[in-house]
Amino acid sequence: MAIKAYRPITPAQRKKTTEDYDQITTNKPMKSLLKAKKQQAGKNNQGRITVRHRGGGVKRHYRIMTYNLPKDLTLTVEEIEYDPNRSARIARVQDQNGTYYYVLADTKMTKGTTFKTGSDIEVEDSSRMPLSNIPVGTFVYAIELTPGRGAQMVRAAGASAQLMAKEDGYATLKMPSGEVRKVLAGCEASIGTVSNLQHQNVKKGSAGRVRRKGIRPTVRGVVMNATDHPHGGGDGGRHGSGKAPRTPWGQLTLGYRTRHNKKTNKMIVRSRHEGKRK
């Protein structure tokens, strides 16, 4: 996969880059696996903004993804498709019974390739099996946190985790963030790397392209009024209050740790922040 650049016929095209879409084989999704997606604009059921900077953008249909494939299936890749709801490509696959699924596509998937799910299968690209059956050193994606719950980790474009060790019923994984953590060896994962490797190198190039993705502008707190942000106010403006930076709700930010889930600390062997400490 490559990145496509443009001749600067317009100012917006000067720094704009796009993906080349070479892996995609069709532009027509399967209607039975589509669902209407109502835009929430970052608001909850009470109409209050819970996620800022959301709203507008083009209309989309949601593709019904299957993150928990049944066991003992032989699946054939029918098409590789674009999905506007995620950074990775998706694969339309069919099992031996004629049932269709949408799954995350990896870098090795092409139209016509086959892969299997289950415990007693060969270790091949795209195969899905428990971590206990995967050799140490293998790169995996779409990893479960709880057996049978479906993939929750390593689903973004170009992502993969490496299986580092297996002992005492746990598998040790090195995550894309650099974190090393344990998960139950019975959790399933797919072998390979998520598709669309160059996604992180795409430059949007213009404000309009960002708005079409449903992202609204972000305003700095220092240019707001004092009632709207802890950094706001001041005659003529201030460029720093002399205090620690805070969020609009008064929480310390820019490096301040806000993680409270202490129950899973025992599963984290090495924090993703470890390499940043001096």
Segments (PLM) and residue ranges:
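Basic, glycine/proline-rich low-complexity segments that contact nucleic acids
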Residues: M1-N85, K111-K278
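Short acidic-glycine loop/turn motifs at beta-strand connectors
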Residues: D95-G98, P176-S177
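Beta-strand/loop nucleic-acid-binding surfaces
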Residues: G98-T110
